Amino acid sequence: MGVYFLLLFVGLCWGQYNPNTLPKRTSIVHLFEWRWQDIAQECERYLAPNGFGGVQISPPNENVIITDPQQPWWERYQPVSYKLCTRSGNETEFRDMVTRCNNVGVHIYVDAVINHMCGANAGAGDHATCGSYFNAKTEDFPAVPYSGWDFNDHKCKSKSGNIEDYHDISQVRDCRLVSLLDLALGKDYVRSRIAEYLNRLIDIGVAGFRIDAAKHMWPEDVKAILDKLKDLNARWFPAGTKPFIYQEVIDLGGEPIKGSDYFGNGRVTEFKYGAKLGTVLRKWNGEKMAYLKNWGEGWGFVPTDRALVFVDNHDNQRGHGAGGSSILTFWDSRLYKMASGFMLAHPYGFTRVMSSFRWPRYFENGKDINDWVGPPSNADGSIKPVTINEDTTCGNDWVCEHRWRQIKNMVIFRNVVDGEPFSNWWDNGSNQVAFGRGNKGFIIFNNDDWSLNISLQTGLPAGTYCDVISGQKEGDFCTAVEVHVATDGMANFLIGNEDKDPFIAIHVDAKL
């Protein structure tokens, strides 16, 4: 009896690290700036059938409408209230999305913008997505309500009121991030307003939260807010389930604030992951894939059960945030597919796949001057629907990386090999590497400038397997390269360095 209660207690304490996805659903996808009605459809027609565990959505709460530049993507990170109306849809559409996605086993993770309100220069008026009045100059947000007493101006010690020195911990947490009005999260009143908002989302059925700008909040303030949260809605989650928490903490190693400061609250975003993986696949600074043998904690990353990992995110794919020019994105599609394949095959961390929109990149002196451009929209500012082409790709400038065969099939690969150990590593000392996941899956990469032809131990049962990168198994038929595994687990692999996708992945569910 005692052991049962102990396990129950541990479960209650550690729930915030558990993604709450269904068993054997091991990844989420960020449908950046998608409309709620498109997400609901995507859950039903694509994400559920292909084993995706959940969706990170753009902030669902009311934001300021910025007209100079014209409705940039970052206006959604400038709250005016916690009402549920944005360019992605209204509260009715939001509730419909959460219900429909949950009903097919795909959960919703909300991007929670709780560190701040809108920018100090956002003016006064009702230019907000629900039409709520606000006055940024006097810090008056009656739709919450917040007033000047609810902000950190008196606590901030920098001259400008903005963060000027990232080596000064209190500045980073008490001053304004790029002039965004910094909420006084030390006040119980403010904590309660935020918790009310998050609890409303929990009641609707969301599964967890990405805590935006967590680095700019004191960990104990975040904890105080999380302590006020309800358990998840028992209609879709086991009784007593805690919301999954992952905190945006950009820690590349050069500052006093560490990702580990936030482990008590939940997982953290491991920004070193994509930055380093990009450097390796681009072969910069003498890096090579052979060095990935001890990938994960061996590279100085946070512990695997505290990490949320990704190749790129909505910030760093356009030069914001962290990682610089090493970050791989859909613009570098060949390397991007390899990076995504490596991430989804490797056991480290909980994986998030990016799904982007195209924008007109324009570089001047190494900076993309169009990095602000918002989602594909109509003349009236409404977001364009995600249309689906005959070949299953998306139209209207939606990139839909999560629908690329190579990435979707690796999401499935990760589900198949879930819980299996990292095994049978091989490398050629350069940029040809391979590894398995127990006796369930095997993957091999050729990122060298010459072809690969080798027989390796796969750890897999004997038989003929269909490569899920160059094609896939459809019924009893393989549209791709076939790999023959002998009775001793050995198989021969041939990958030309000019191949469209210079990697091969096989798993037990792709056995013919």
State each model region's role.
Residues 6-27, 42-48, 52-53, 59-79, ...:
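Active-site-proximal helices and loops of the catalytic beta/alpha 8
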Residues 185-197:
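Alpha-helical scaffold elements lining the catalytic groove of polysaccharide deacetylases
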Residues 31-33, 84-86, 213:
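Short glycine-centered, acidic/aromatic-flanked micro-motifs in structured strand/loop junctions
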Residues 1-3:
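Positively charged n-region of N-terminal signal peptides that target proteins for export
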Residues 34, 50, 121:
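Active-site-proximal N-terminal segment of extracellular/periplasmic enzymes that hydrolyze or transfer
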Residues 125, 129-133:
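Eukaryotic low-complexity intrinsically disordered regions
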Residues 16-36, 177-182, 187:
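Boundary/entry segment of secreted carbohydrate-active catalytic domains
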Residues 26, 63-99, 132-184:
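Aromatic- and acidic-residue-enriched carbohydrate-binding clefts of CAZyme catalytic domains
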